[in-house]
Amino acid sequence: MKNLKTIGFVLLISFLVSGCAMDRSFRKESEPQKIIIERESSEKVEALAERVKTLEESVSKLRSEIVFLEKHFRNIQARPPLSSYKLPKEVTLCGEKIPLEDRNVWENLDREFIVALDSHAQILLWMKRARRYFPHIEKRLKEMNLPDDLKYVAITESSLRPHAVSSSGAAGVWQFIPSTGEKYGMRRNKTLDERFDFLKATEGALAYLKSLYDEFGSWTLAMAAYNAGENRIRREIEFQKAKDYFYLDLPMETERYVYKIAVAKIILSDPGKYGFYLEDRDFYDPLQLERVQIELKQPLPLLGVARAIGCYYKEIKEMNPHLTEESVPVGSHFLNLPQGTSERFWIFFNHWRKELEGK
């Protein structure tokens, strides 16, 4: 009996010792696993946090899109059907009354009015671009004592697209054909086409319109001549023995031309009245630039100009669409620069010129 107790005691001690050893071994084996689990948990938390951040950004974008679509939908709902818009009872253009009491005249204007109103995207673009280009045109019209309504000629000519080119070869915002452009000082060769220089073309267009008015004594006839050419209008006046644009038989494009200008004025004078709404941030930025005049004996690389004044080459090219090559050609030229960069330009230009002279 005593031996059995002794054996039992020994077995108990052995069990306890082996158990402690196993516990130590288990703890040793568990510690790396715990570290691995903690590391994996940390990585999962970071991944989840990154995923949450991505989802939050997506939600933010979706919210912005929802706000935009809701606003767009409200605008569509707010716009009455096209048939509800009516022409004003009286319409003038450059101070000249359009004879709407004549049903044929009213019908012609009404047709252009409806066609324009149906071109929702086009009118929005008119509004956006007008903020960019109209201020300069309005300023020059006022300085030249010309009717403010002449700015709408540029809308009808090109929708204020500076790179516009027609099938007949007319170019720029004011759509000059080569011969008329040259007559009003716009040079054209393989290195430049100044019909695309908005500022220079504006000077030419306003001078041309004034010249046409001086000849025909009517702004509507002057506009018609701007479209069809003064020779054509002279011939039609002589042949038809009539001097009123609205009662002359003219080419279809010219017959519609002045009506389109009048419609542009009607809509852009009060776009909200016809269901067109834009917030201030939706408009294109006004034209802001500095214009320098330079005399060149060697072509001036535009890339060098861009680097010197701290802008991209593309920006310089877009500001000077009349320059068709990579350099400003030899001769006297105007160069458009981003606002606030002319001082840096002159430092570069004078240094560049001295280097050339030293060679």
Where are these regions (language model features)?
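C-terminal motif of bacterial Sec signal peptides marking the signal peptidase cleavage site
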Residues: 18-19
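Sec-dependent N-terminal signal peptides
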Residues: 6-15
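An acidic, Gly/Ser/Thr/Pro-rich helix-cap/linker signature
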Residues: 22-145
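Extracytoplasmic and endomembrane cell-envelope/extracellular-matrix remodeling and assembly machinery
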Residues: 82-132, 143, 188-191, 195-215, ...
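Short, surface-exposed glycine/acidic/tryptophan-bearing loops
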Residues: 108, 112, 164-185
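Alpha-helical scaffolds flanking conserved acidic
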Residues: 147-154, 171, 219-224
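N-terminal secretory signal peptides that target proteins for export/translocation
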Residues: 1-3
